[in-house]
Curated annotation (Swiss-Prot):
SUPFAM superfamilies: (Phosphotyrosine protein) phosphatases II (SSF52799)
Gene assigned in the entry: dusp29
Function: Dual specificity phosphatase able to dephosphorylate phosphotyrosine, phosphoserine and phosphothreonine residues within the same substrate, with a preference for phosphotyrosine as a substrate. Involved in the modulation of AMPK and MAPK1/2 signaling pathways.
Family per similarity comment: Belongs to the protein-tyrosine phosphatase family. Non-receptor class dual specificity subfamily.
Binding-site residues for substrate, renumbered to this chain: 126-133
EC number: 3.1.3.16, 3.1.3.48
GO molecular function, one term: MAP kinase phosphatase activity
Keyword Nucleus listed: yes
Gene3D superfamilies linked: Protein tyrosine phosphatase superfamily (3.90.190.10)
Designated name of the protein: Dual specificity phosphatase 29
Species assigned in the record: Danio rerio (Zebrafish)
Keywords: Cytoplasm, Hydrolase, Nucleus, Protein phosphatase
GO annotation terms (biological process): negative regulation of MAPK cascade; protein dephosphorylation
Amino acid sequence: MSSAQAEDEQDYETPSCYELQKHFTHGGVAYTHVNEVWPGVYIGNEETARDRYKLQTLGITHILNAAEGEWNSVDTGAEYYKDMQIHYYGVTAEDTPTFNISQYFYSAAEYIQQTLSDPHNKLLLHCVMGRSRSATLFLAFLMLQQRMSLLQAVEQLAHRRHICPNWGFLKQLRELDTHLQEERRRTHT
């Protein structure tokens, strides 16, 4: 790491939720059913998750459903993809500001990282709209596995997909960012 990068990391402050939301509206990406947001990673909505032909066309080998559950969910499950040879991982998360999605940050990031360890794999990360729960988990992946700050992760994703994590999820991502930045500062001093 260069001294300029180290200085930038030391000067970095986690942006407010309001500041982060400004990046969502300035990304300039129109809302679509699915977007490739990282090599081999697609974020999409329920329609994409249920479109077996589209999944085959995209070459999807793995699915992370960030909307399992009984309320505002996508109830596909592993059975839905059984005959397609798609590896399925589901997260029971509600898209409400009070829901603790941070409990899935590390496990989802690990699943994404394991999926991407084979360059032939392609992952669809989805929720109902592909804008809040799935985006939040992918932002956590970028922060945890790619060592991005929250701001870097938001900028990376917002230029590839129209996202809008709810206010509570943004607060949890901010807490993760603060924790990771403190941890990185400790290891560099």
